[in-house]
Amino acid sequence: MLRSLLLLAPLVGAAVLGVRDNSQECPGYKATNIREGRNSLTADLTLAGTPCNTYGTDLKNLKLLVEYQTDKRLHVKIYDADEEVYQVPESVLPRVDGKGGSGKKSALKFDYQANPFSFKVKRGGEVLFDTSGSNLIFQSQYLNLRTWLPEDPNLYGLGEHTDSLRLETTNYTRTLWNRDAYAIPEKTNLYGTHPVYYDHRGQDGTHGVFLLNSNGMDIKIDKTEDGKQYLEYNTLGGVFDFYFFTGATPKDASIEYAKVVGLPAMQSYWTFGFHQCRYGYRDVFEVAEVVYNYTQAKIPLETMWTDIDYMDRRRVFTLDPERFPLEKLRELVTYLHNHNQRYIVMVDPAVSVSDNVGYNDGMEQGIFLQTQNGSLYKGAVWPGVTAYPDWFHPDIQKYWNDQFAKFFDRKTGVDIDGLWIDMNEAANFCPYPCSDPEGYSRDNDLPPAAPPVRPSNPRPLPGFPGDFQPSSSSKRSTKGSKVGLPNRDLINPPYMIRNEAGSLSNKTINTDIIHAGEGYAEYDTHNLYGTMMSSASRNAMQHRRPEVRPLVITRSTYAGAGAHVGHWLGDNISEWSKYRVSIAQMLAFASMFQVPMIGSDVCGFGGNTTEELCARWARLGAFYTFFRNHNEITGIPQEFYRWPTVAESARKAIDIRYRLLDYIYTAFHRQTQTGEPFLQPMFYLYPKDKNTFSNQLQFFYGDAILVSPVTDGSQTSVDAYFPDDIFYDWHTGAALRGRGANVTLGNIDVTEIPIHIRGGSIIPIRSESAMTTTELRKKGFELIIAPGLDGTASGSLYLDDGDSIEQRATLELEFTYRKGRLRVKGKFGFRTDVKINAVTLLGQSAPASKSGSVASFDSGRQAVTIKTSLDLTGPSEIDLN
């Protein structure tokens, strides 16, 4: 949502790093009392000299724990001996079992030097992580560790950012400190924290390094004066809790990461449909009109969304009684449900400090953040003066469940189908120190004035209820607590990370707030606020409907968020640069951070889109997993039906997306079961091809579909890279033999997007599209067989009831094609009336021996299509010769 109010606040420059090289001045540590077991190593680490106390007090006694957790995963943890220093709570990110591995069998090996202490992680004879270049620093408010890297490394990850997918390696700093970041600027910290990087070394494999630490940090990637490459961690606290994992390919490494942070949550079938939203729908009549207009334009609309416009003076858990009265809003939701469509609204964390149910209940239960003197902590957001829920409070889940149960009650409230949570970094418009939130709200017109009330809809909407037609009248630290050391400066730490907003507390919750429950400081847990709201919100949605998969889309995330929620990429703007960077962002979240329900605001959120940009973005957005058009109140309306070319582009885009929806659903389900990514950079499938390592403008949609969008305005061609393999044009069926070079694809109309099927694939598609996913599930299937260079192909299909958390029966099919024969086998538990009605074999120069009504040959597409009537009830085999 637009953050224009931030412009009213005084600007605070980004913090500047210290000028001296601390690692050379500090003594480091020496390892003693070293004990090695079958799958572990422990040691005491003692400060090796005079403390340097550069950005805090050097801790004299540390512990080292090394665990060979699996054959592909190594855990290395350096922490304080008294275990007072804050560690990420297991309630936020549960730890994986570390007892199954063996040092002898592990692909990763841990080596160390005792004095001064340093360590290396090796894979075979190759060094993956080497801290010998500088001394370990472990201070009360500053941790530093540096590792050497190979020359010109292929590094990825360290989100959230809008920089290149393959990270820069000279004078580059990634700052992790979640913030409200309008326009998602480059080279800054954004909404989420994902402290994991992947190092891809071509044919030697890929490894990942995850630092389980939620404190603010700078991660620097640079070269020394003599040209040696390094990566350096600079954190404001916490411990060094590393997970190293390795794989033969990038995909394998991503799978290993999922085992650490949790497998993604499965989503309902309908969530992959098209979604529409806008900040600025003035009333329920306008929302209804948008729904009606999509239907009239014959553009499928699965889910209608409403931003904070529906609220009474922007207060959560309220309705504007004049513009979104309960009775009319319930009528709209009923209309949507009767037409197999859905409805979603936004909920922010900040609760208005005023007489309303959310605030009154929260005060009664004491679940809001408090200052250290026990008074209510207040900020200023859209409704004006606000209080913030304390997600660590022992009663917070009950409070959140109760608010959802009352406001979103199916019989008496707003019966939403999914949830959108925003502003949960947490955002605070009032700059630090926010000593007068009341005055700030008054001076900045918070809440903003609502639009004039319309007594009825100004135009008729045939099919909608009468109400939508025109009216005739018009805790403190103790030893072993792991909650944080005492006597720290929680507002202005000695080391300042490069937070774009300036001081740590600026435009967010004060970092000296102490949470209820265990007594964690906001200083340590700031980056967890959004992900904890996500977990509580998912639980509250599930409490409403225990049997169905809850869709929750969040702005702020932390490592492991995908196990609970999806993510939209925040407040982008309507520019080609944001269109392009959305690809890299999507790939990082889906493949590297294990948050596969992902997408950006199609056509752009801020500013005014153009017809060409929106038409191109409609085609690209159809290949996000989360596909939503959304923009802000000061921009021109940009629903797809507003321009003829955009409407045509959207119809084409959704037609292909919906026909592919079961292919999407199948691959998405696989990721939730194994961690195998669905959306992938090119180098995930061609890990030995160096030309793919920095390609961030093409991507694979599953293993079978290569998408090569036009990425600049006024262009009708794209230079697309095709690895050494065979591909088939989605539209024409023409075979394209890739040679590891660029191919110019021309004459690409603004309503089109280049799509190619990778050889060796079998893709199940629906025989035709539909206006809703409910109707889509009634359509039959076709199989497209795209033989690989060896003449074989394979694919899969997963079906279930599309909604339930616990599935009573599933259909899991495997397709194989070899020597002219198609075989179908698998698990046939889920019953469906639809059949496989046709099989199309690409890459054929002559018709099949079959003739008549059974088979047909298309010489233009070089494809043979055979009509079938295969029930999905048991194994089958077809001769395609």
From Swiss-Prot:
Active-site residue numbers: D422 (nucleophile), E425, D571 (proton donor)
Protein name: Probable alpha/beta-glucosidase agdC
Family: Belongs to the glycosyl hydrolase 31 family.
Gene this chain is encoded by: agdC
Keywords for the protein's UniProt record, in alphabetical order: Carbohydrate metabolism, Cell wall biogenesis/degradation, Glycoprotein, Glycosidase, Hydrolase, Polysaccharide degradation, Secreted, Signal
GO BP field: cell wall organization; polysaccharide catabolic process
Its EC number(s): 3.2.1.20, 3.2.1.21
Top-rank EC class of the record's enzyme: hydrolase
GO cellular component terms, semicolon-separated: extracellular region
Record InterPro entries: Gal_mutarotase_sf_dom, Glyco_hydro_31_AS, Glyco_hydro_31_C, Glyco_hydro_31_N_dom, Glyco_hydro_31_TIM, Glyco_hydro_b, Glycoside_hydrolase_SF
Main location, first listed in the record: secreted
Physiological role: Glucosidase involved in the degradation of cellulosic biomass. Has both alpha- and beta-glucosidase activity.
Residues bearing glycans: N171, N293, N373, N506, N572, N608, N742
Region (Disordered): 440-485
GO molecular function, one term: alpha-1,4-glucosidase activity
Pro residues bias locations: 448-463
Signal sequence annotation: 1-14
Localization annotation: Secreted
Catalysed reactions, semicolon-separated: Hydrolysis of terminal, non-reducing (1->4)-linked alpha-D-glucose residues with release of alpha-D-glucose; Hydrolysis of terminal, non-reducing beta-D-glucosyl residues with release of beta-D-glucose
